[in-house]
Amino acid sequence: MSKDGKPDRCIAYVSEKVGGKFSALPCVAGVSCLKNRTSVEFSTEKIYEPYVRKETASAVAEVLVLFYKYRFFSDLLPLPSLKQEERELLLTALVSADFQTDKKYTETRLSGLDEYRIDGVFFFRLQELKESWVRIASYVPNEFSPAALYSFVQFLSSEGEGRIFLQGESAYDEEYRPLKKSALIGEYSAPKEILLSGARHVYCFGEQTEETKDFLKKYYAEKTFFC
């Protein structure tokens, strides 16, 4: 996988996700920079290559439908009626809403490529997907209100599936794997991680910040369990 620019959160995400998945196998990640382009390559034994490639494609697809989609919506939606934190929450919710569908489509567009030049894929192989994002953005009025945000996030939480676990502010999926999707759209945030997970129930251990508690009380009041 390669990307224009210096090593960044996208490179780190793919490297950590794939490397972590195969940490018990002879799989080595190497990051290199050449002419203002950064690449991450994975070396493994031939028998494991199909599995490493599949996981790499999955991670690259997540970068495209998280990092790139968030920036895409951010450019289209100024949302002056919302505070900065409310706007970020709405953008996160919009990214989360079709995450699985977007990811599956993106994986089909990666199929057959020898190298994932991630910015090239975004600009030239995701036209249909980007057109759907433009349509979605057109449904969001410039005067989108905090009340509308509340209703939208409430709807997403009611449609969620599965569980997410919080140990303090660290989020884990049902297999207790750390979740770091929110790091692709800004600073790591437990509330954003909850939204991006698409979970229906939240199980909390340890102590959460007031920000996270307020988020849970507002949007997941009947779906949160403190253990």
Go through each PLM region and give its residues.
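C-terminal structured domains
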Residues: 174-227
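Conserved mixed alpha/beta catalytic, RNA-binding, or beta-rich assembly cores of soluble enzyme
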Residues: 1-188, 192-194
